[in-house]
């Protein structure tokens, strides 16, 4: 299994088939969707979902209800859209994926809340979207995608979440809102306080299928 970063929150997971998670407008969407078999979207914000390219791809898409509605309104075929919620177990293109969580992290008490789900791919790779999703007990996550910037994020919360998930390694996501120095500072704290390997390269090979 290989995991590739394609900018901001977009990650490609290549195993027996290829899944794209969160191809948003701040990502290299065309490269991410090329040769993909399915798309997983955590929530409807444009930095996680570039509507027009995803619709044009014709790929099957899994996501919470607002994502499905947004894509359908833009012309996506309904039979290619699959609504999910936390607790679901799905098999896009033959890969087992657990759907986790329910809500986007709070930005402000006066701001609206948004649906958000995380995806745990093959019990190995975790993408939380914009939330600190809980994982099932006893699941040894190999790689967690860790948000490092955003209006809803504090590095202390990130550290606590990584400690709870206890992945073998992490890759940074949700980084377009920070400078490179800011991203590196966040990763330094995660590395220092979580006893975890931080992968700074664009891709990582986890081995196996």
Predicted regions and their residues:
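Binuclear metal-ion centers of metallo-dependent hydrolases, dominated by the metallo-beta-lactamase
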Residues: 1-4, 75-93, 138, 159, ...
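Redox-cofactor binding/interface segments in oxidoreductases and associated redox assembly factors
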Residues: 21-22, 40-41, 98-102, 146, ...
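Conserved alpha/beta-hydrolase "acid-adjacent" motif
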Residues: 48-50, 154, 180
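Active-site metal-binding motif and surrounding structural segment of the metallo-beta-lactamase
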Residues: 25-70, 141-145, 166
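Core dinuclear metal-dependent hydrolase active-site scaffold
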Residues: 1-34, 83-140, 152-154, 202-209
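Catalytic metal-binding/acid-base residues of hydrolase active sites
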Residues: 45, 67, 103, 132, ...
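Short glycine/proline-enriched coil/turn segments at helix->beta-strand junctions
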Residues: 15-17, 34-36, 56-60, 76-78, ...
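Active-site-proximal segments of metal-dependent phosphoesterases and phosphodiesterases across multiple
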Residues: 143-163
């Amino acid at each position: 299994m290989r995991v590739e970063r394609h900018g901001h929150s977009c990650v490609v997971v290549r195993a027996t088939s290829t899944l794209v998670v969160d191809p948003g407008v701040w990502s290299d969407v065309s490269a991410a969707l090329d040769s993909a078999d399915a798309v997983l979207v955590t929530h409807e914000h444009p930095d996680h979902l570039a509507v027009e390219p995803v619709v044009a791809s014709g790929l099957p898409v899994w996501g919470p209800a607002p994502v499905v509605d947004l894509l359908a309104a833009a012309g996506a075929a309904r039979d290619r859209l699959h609504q999910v919620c936390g607790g679901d177990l799905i098999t896009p293109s033959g890969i087992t994926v657990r759907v986790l969580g329910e809500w986007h992290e709070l930005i402000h008490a006066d701001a609206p809340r948004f649906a958000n789900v995380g995806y745990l791919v093959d019990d190995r790779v975790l993408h939380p979207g914009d939330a600190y999703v809980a994982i099932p007990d006893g699941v040894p996550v190999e790689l967690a995608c860790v948000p490092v910037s955003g209006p809803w994020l504090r590095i202390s919360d990130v550290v606590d979440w990584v400690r709870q998930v206890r992945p073998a390694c992490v890759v940074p996501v949700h980084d377009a809102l920070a400078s490179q120095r800011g991203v590196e500072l966040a990763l330094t704290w995660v590395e220092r306080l979580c006893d975890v390997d931080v992968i700074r390269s664009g891709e990582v090979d986890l081995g196996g299928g």
